[in-house]
């Protein structure tokens, strides 16, 4: 009988996308199911996954409501224990976030094997809390910030997780002769990408021929399309859930936030990028993600608090005009990617699950 694996996720795309990738890695070898809260469901095609809704509310900062949240959490822990017993789960894999708390606590109480996943270069708070209980934690590097030295032996380094369609499309032949510019604001959106970046592009288009692929909220589609077309700028707009690999294939340069999944995809497709990390990200993890790859020579990095339209415009002009530096970054990415194959990651994850 196959082992029963439960993957816990929810919240933003940064938690959900890796969970779906792990699911696909395991579904041929194990009996796999997934839990998500209501927020995470919008990033999922429910027909593809054995999915159960397990909604967890964030802990309130209101002192009057905290006791109710505590009672609700106790209820969810007992619900988790019941779920584990009923479904005879052997291993829980958590992608982090507060929505994983009751399930991880339930796994701890029942002595169920617990594996954690940390895609960021800073250890998340939920993962830190359960580090002493877990058997292993999957990371992209041994040098994770805020990681306790005494638990370093629990790190299992794997190549960055990518959706399988990225491996099927490897013809990434790009140059800056025609500038195809991709703009990715992340699953939570970004007003700076809708305003400041858009204005910089309009100025840039006065001297360069551009084709814009921009991720934005669907409510902006008509207004953005009109603005770009009025300036004779070709554009294609898309939502977060659209197949981003199709846009990366066409892209010369990307302006992006610094979520771990997005950076992994850009690195793999050898798409040099200008990273503008979300300054309000917990523990400043987006900056640390971008900084890690910046040291490897993959990207350019700007601090949102220090840029305006002119700064961004000048940076883009400098990148476009300096083709030698651009090509060096592409080569650095190519050299980095040689170990990232679907089968290699498959073997690493499965070997950890099968460890006693």
UniProtKB/Swiss-Prot annotation:
CC annotations in GO: plasma membrane
Enzyme Commission code(s) on record: 2.4.1.227
GO biological process, one term: regulation of cell shape
Principal localisation: membrane
Subcellular location: Cell inner membrane
Membrane topology: Peripheral membrane protein
Keywords assigned by UniProt, alphabetized: Cell cycle, Cell division, Cell inner membrane, Cell membrane, Cell shape, Cell wall biogenesis/degradation, Glycosyltransferase, Membrane, Peptidoglycan synthesis, Transferase
SUPFAM superfamilies named in the record: UDP-Glycosyltransferase/glycogen phosphorylase
One Gene Ontology term of the molecular function aspect: undecaprenyldiphospho-muramoylpentapeptide beta-N-acetylglucosaminyltransferase activity
Annotated binding of UDP-N-acetyl-alpha-D-glucosamine, by residue: 12-14, 120, 163, 187, 286
Recorded metabolic or biological pathway in which this protein acts: Cell wall biogenesis; peptidoglycan biosynthesis
CDD domains on file: GT28_MurG (cd03785)
Catalytic reactions on record: di-trans,octa-cis-undecaprenyl diphospho-N-acetyl-alpha-D-muramoyl-L-alanyl-D-glutamyl-meso-2,6-diaminopimeloyl-D-alanyl-D-alanine + UDP-N-acetyl-alpha-D-glucosamine = di-trans,octa-cis-undecaprenyl diphospho-[N-acetyl-alpha-D-glucosaminyl-(1->4)]-N-acetyl-alpha-D-muramoyl-L-alanyl-D-glutamyl-meso-2,6-diaminopimeloyl-D-alanyl-D-alanine + UDP + H(+)
Gene3D superfamilies: Glycogen Phosphorylase B (3.40.50.2000)
EC primary class: transferase
Family listed: Belongs to the glycosyltransferase 28 family. MurG subfamily.
Function, as annotated: Cell wall formation. Catalyzes the transfer of a GlcNAc subunit on undecaprenyl-pyrophosphoryl-MurNAc-pentapeptide (lipid intermediate I) to form undecaprenyl-pyrophosphoryl-MurNAc-(pentapeptide)GlcNAc (lipid intermediate II).
Protein's recorded name: UDP-N-acetylglucosamine--N-acetylmuramyl-(pentapeptide) pyrophosphoryl-undecaprenol N-acetylglucosamine transferase
Taxonomic lineage of the native organism: Bacteria, Pseudomonadati, Pseudomonadota, Alphaproteobacteria, Candidatus Pelagibacterales
